[in-house]
């Protein structure tokens, strides 16, 4: 249920703001796992 979206995140665990909603970076490669509730 986790969708990976390309983001400009550099640090691990950094919060991201995407059109889909608030995403939190949980990937080392800089990808974010977006979960919209």
From Swiss-Prot:
Expressed by the venom gland. Disulfide bonds: none annotated. Transmembrane segments: none annotated. GO terms for cellular component: extracellular region; host cell presynaptic membrane. It is found in: Secreted. InterPro entries: Omega-agatoxin_II/III_CS (IPR005853), Toxin_34 (IPR013605). It holds the Pfam family Toxin_34. GO terms for molecular function: calcium channel regulator activity; toxin activity. Keywords: Calcium channel impairing toxin, Ion channel impairing toxin, Neurotoxin, Presynaptic neurotoxin, Secreted, Toxin, Voltage-gated calcium channel impairing toxin. Omega-agatoxins are antagonists of voltage-gated calcium channels (Cav). They block neuromuscular transmission presynaptically. Belongs to the neurotoxin 04 (omega-agtx) family. 03 (type II/III omega-agtx) subfamily. This is U1-ctenitoxin-Asp1a. It comes from Ancylometes sp.
């Amino acid at each position: 249920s986790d969708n990976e979206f390309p983001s400009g995140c550099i640090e691990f665990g950094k919060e991201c703001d995407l059109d889909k909603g608030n995403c939190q970076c949980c990937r080392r490669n800089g990808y974010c796992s977006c979960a919209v509730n």
